[in-house]
Amino acid sequence: IRPFKAYRPQLDLVEKVSTLPYDVMNSEEALAMVEGNPYSFLHVDKSEIDLPKDIDIHDKQVYLKARENLQKMISDKVYIQDEKPCMYIYRQIMDGRSQTGIVACVSIDDYIKNTIKKHELTRSDKELDRFNHVDYTNCNTGPIFLTYRHKNKIDFIVKTWTETKTPVYSYKSEDGVSQIIWVVDEKDVTSELSAIFAKIDYLYIADGHHRSASAVKVGLKRRQDNPSYDGDEEFNYFLSVIFPDNDLYVMDYNRVVADLFGNSFDEFMNKVSEKFDITAGDGIGQFKPKVKRTYGMFLEGKWYKLEAKEGSFNLKDRKSV
């Protein structure tokens, strides 16, 4: 990993700039959220809100508008670039629990060599959307969420910095999460962090498979366009926030199925039983899996434990993790 010169919002504008991720809302919701707020980052991340409604969200005009909006915010000094390469410490606090990570740039070569492990397949349409967004804006507008097996030395550096330095931002975002950020602007500290991370075997993508795949493809395109590249150019890296495993809270990721696709209850359960061993719950609260390849299912007012049968999954899918 390495430090970089981030573009950061002015202190008095940070709460107006800050917004929810682009993929948790549709265009109409985003338009309502930015009403009266020209500083919202949604003008960059969902720039179709500033175009006529009949324009497709994947039209070239959308990406050009994102670039235009970002460049205007920079020229209007909504964002100021740090004068020297820094790393950043990012802390989130929700429901009394905090997690703290390091914001830095990560090499696309680590992604290509599988030093950065993936656990999801990606959709080509979503990849193309993020590819165009990064390519047109010439910017990583959202970090990849990575994790690693914690190192005591990194924990100590982060703890020392956050206890002895004043955060540059500290506010509560619209979803109720406290957002606290420190700027790590001392070269000896960023160099030490880079050296420690260089000895870590693997990083793991917790969130951002489409964004990372797209950023890597943009980097490879820029390499083709610049055959004399030396590897130090910014397109060889992508923005990431890296959390240690001992500070990471993995939230439930559930799916709601609208109907049983014409199956009766018994027919549906029979089909599920082809791939899973089913155990009815005891009726007390939600079933939360505690071991691999085990799932909870809530159907017709009752919880069930599903355990994947041998042969129902591809062992090769585990290689990357």
Regions found by a protein language model. Give the residues of each.
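Surface-exposed, charge/polar-rich loops and edge strands
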Residues: 1-320
